[in-house]
Amino acid sequence: MSKSCGNNLAAISVGISLLLLLVVCGIGCVWHWKHRVATRFTLPRFLQRRSSRRKVCTKTFLGPRIIGLRHEISVETQDHKSAVRGNNTHDNYENVEAGPPKAKGKTDKELYENTGQSNFEEHIYGNETSSDYYNFQKPRPSEVPQDEDIYILPDSY
């Protein structure tokens, strides 16, 4: 009799806990549906399209604005800054100018080419001794042709 009473008590406690879990989930769903309009899922800023970024920025900046030193830029520095802005990799690539590369004083080849005279008999590393493969020559075919032909015959059983 005591075993059946224990089983009933366990079943009732599991049932009540599942019922409470169901009630909590229901309240959470109702709260989410009521507040769904206020909180919308948005992508991170770098994944948004440029037009949607403008909409988000205009919505967020409708309140009072604080203007710092960054916004007070003269015309000369603004032109320079817009030219530098094209090189920023975080900006959108819509307004980047494309064209042939500009001629520079030094080309990449001149920068990386080793123009210094080097002694080829010296090793690159001072402590390296000459190895067996340093003056390696391919074996020459013998000038005397071999008259013997070698045949390998299978074992006969």
Curated annotation (Swiss-Prot):
Q: Which UniProt keywords apply?
A: B-cell activation, Cell membrane, Membrane, Transmembrane, Transmembrane helix
The transmembrane residues are: 11-31
Where is this chain's protein located in or outside the cell?
Cell membrane
Residue numbers spanned by region Disordered: 78-108
Q: How does it sit in the membrane?
A: Single-pass membrane protein
What InterPro entries does the record point to? Protein_GAPT (IPR021082)
GO CC annotations, alphabetized: Golgi apparatus; intracellular membrane-bounded organelle; plasma membrane
Instruction: Please cite one Gene Ontology biological process associated with this protein.
Output: B cell homeostasis
The tissues where this chain's protein is expressed are given as: Highly expressed in spleen and PBL, detected at lower levels in thymus, and undetectable in all other tissues tested. Also expressed in various B-cell lines, monocytic cell line THP-1 and NK-like cell line YT, but not in T-cell line Jurkat or HeLa cells.
Q: What is the effect of changing residue 145 to A?
A: Abolishes interaction with GRB2
Question: Is Membrane given among the entry's keywords?
Answer: yes
Quaternary context: Interacts with GRB2.
Q: What does this protein do?
A: Negatively regulates B-cell proliferation following stimulation through the B-cell receptor. May play an important role in maintenance of marginal zone (MZ) B-cells.
- Family to which this protein belongs: Belongs to the GAPT family.
Protein name according to UniProt: Protein GAPT
Natural source organism: Homo sapiens
Give the classification, highest ranks: Eukaryota, Metazoa, Chordata, Craniata, Vertebrata
Gene of this entry: GAPT
